[in-house]
A protein has these predicted regions:
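Juxtamembrane intracellular "pre-TM" segments in multi-pass secondary transporters
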Residues: 2-18, 194-225, 421
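Structural signature of the two symmetry-related core transmembrane helices
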Residues: 85-99, 284-299
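Helix-to-loop junctions at the C-terminal end of transmembrane segments
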Residues: 70-82, 269-282, 366
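Cytoplasmic helix-loop-helix junction between adjacent transmembrane helices
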Residues: 113-152
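Helix-loop boundary and gating motifs at the non-cytosolic
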Residues: 17-64, 220-258
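Helix-loop-helix hairpin linking two adjacent transmembrane segments in secondary transporters
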Residues: 148-190
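Conserved MFS/SLC helix-loop-helix module at the cytosolic interface between two early adjacent transmembrane helices
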Residues: 68-105
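C-terminal membrane-cytosol helix-exit motif in multi-pass small-molecule transporters
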Residues: 180-199, 388-393
């Protein structure tokens, strides 16, 4: 492909999105560039502090539990207080708690602050997703969510590489750098990102949306359930795969080489793949991506070399690239405008719970039945999710066309009655 065609493709991928989106995107990228603690936390606790692997696992679980709690709380805050205040509170709290964690020495204090870090860091996710849905036109949302997902993975890839060098110098420096970068995100949001929550008066006849409304929305909760199944499969890349490779005699470096394929492919392919899938049938994309995820991990049962492990990672990474923006777009499509925060919070909860369940599932299956059964189970779960999406999406009403080409600011979309959004059941 010529440089001219490449440049044109890049321009088409990033054009047409509002300025507010790009400031929010920048905040996300900066946040992930500074995400050092998640990478070296286990090493910090076991090597630097001398705690056991069991204690490190407990701290990781408490961090995840904090995320589960704040998934719902962050969604409620995004609807009640607004997207911008929620982001500012969450990012400031994350910066303070991460810095504090670096100075903790007592095991109870470390565990408690890790829980707070999990709560604070996860509270911003529903607000970010709701804000993107507010400020981006419906026809551009899949592309916007893809670009945001790309920024997350690009930042994490860079921070993961930098974390090793920083840890050799000082673990405390890693905590403080992450705190500083997170605080910088809050500054960007404060200075450049306006509030996007639709004014209540714009839709006076709309019924109040509470958590009960979300939980009674059968169609939406079916999507959340399917999202949980897919997340359960994807989580095995970080919990089941390293254990299985270790038991098969492969070194940590071998696992690092295999899993690095995931980040490299996402950074390289997310934008071009998005151009291919942007206007395609989401039902087909979700069914195919679920099957690819399940069978990609299922193929791991036949891996006997690092090269084959890398090949299986390629398969399920392609599924991840397709599934992530399409799934998020479906969630927004089913969310009423004034309840987006709560709806996004419940959706985020599915991934948070999967992050807690996946390690338990992987450990139990590998210990009792063997790794082959885990990969077979992934194939079954992926197939079930694919069938579920096929049935669910067949019953969805078509998404209505957008009546204006102007950027869908909160006021514009609310005034138009959110015509491009399918009302929640």
């Amino acid at each position: 492909m010529s440089s001219g065609r490449v440049g044109r493709a890049v321009r088409e991928s990033v054009s047409g999105l509002p300025r507010e989106f790009w400031w929010l995107w920048t905040s996300t990228l900066v946040n992930r560039l500074g995400a050092f603690v998640a990478t070296f936390m286990a090493l910090y606790l076991t090597l630097d502090r001398g705690y056991s692997a069991s204690y490190a696992g407990l701290v990781a679980s408490l961090h995840g539990l904090g995320g589960v709690v704040s998934s719902l709380g962050g969604g409620v805050m995004a609807d009640r207080l607004g997207r911008r205040p929620t982001l500012l509170i969450a990012q400031t709290a994350t910066a303070v708690s991460v810095a504090l964690l670096g100075f903790m020495t007592h095991p109870v204090a470390i565990a408690g602050v890790a829980f707070l870090v999990g709560m604070a860091s996860n509270a911003s996710r529903p607000a970010v997703q709701a804000m993107m849905a507010d400020i981006v036109r419906p026809e551009d949302r899949v592309r916007a969510f893809s670009l945001n997902y790309w920024a997350i993975n690009l930042g994490f890839a860079v921070s993961s590489m930098a974390a090793g060098f920083i840890a050799e110098f000082s673990y405390l420096a890693g905590f403080l750098i992450e705190a500083g970068m997170t605080l910088a995100c809050a500054v960007v949001v404060f200075a450049k990102v306006p509030e996007s929550r639709p004014a209540p008066s714009a839709r006076q006849e709309e019924a109040a949306v509470g958590l009960g409304t979300v939980l009674r929305d059968g169609r939406y909760m079916a999507v959340v359930g399917l999202s949980f199944l897919v997340a359960l499969v994807f989580q095995q890349g970080s919990v089941g795969l390293p254990v299985a490779m270790g038991r098969a005699g492969f070194s940590p470096a071998d696992y690092g080489l295999a899993i690095a394929v995931n980040g490299v492919l996402i950074v390289a392919l997310q934008i071009p793949v998005t151009r291919f899938i942007e206007h395609r049938d989401p039902r087909t994309l979700l069914v195919v991506s679920s099957l690819l995820a399940g069978y990609g991990f299922g193929l791991t049962a036949f891996a006997g070399s690092v090269g084959v492990f890398m090949l299986t990672v390629c398969v399920w990474t392609l599924a991840e690239i397709v599934n992530a923006p399409t799934q998020t777009g479906l969630v927004v499509r089913l969310s009423p405008v004034h309840g987006r925060g709560r709806y996004q919070g419940v959706y985020t909860l599915s991934w948070s719970v999967a992050a807690l369940v996946a390690p338990l599932m992987a450990g139990a299956v590998i210990d009792r039945l063997g790794a082959g059964w885990l990969w077979g189970l992934c194939a079954v779960v992926g197939t079930g999710a694919g069938l579920g999406y096929g049935v669910l999406m067949r019953r969805l009403p078509p998404e209505r066309a957008v009546g204006t080409a102007a950027p869908a600011t909160a006021g514009t979309e609310a005034a138009a009655g959110a015509g491009a959004d399918v009302p929640a059941a």
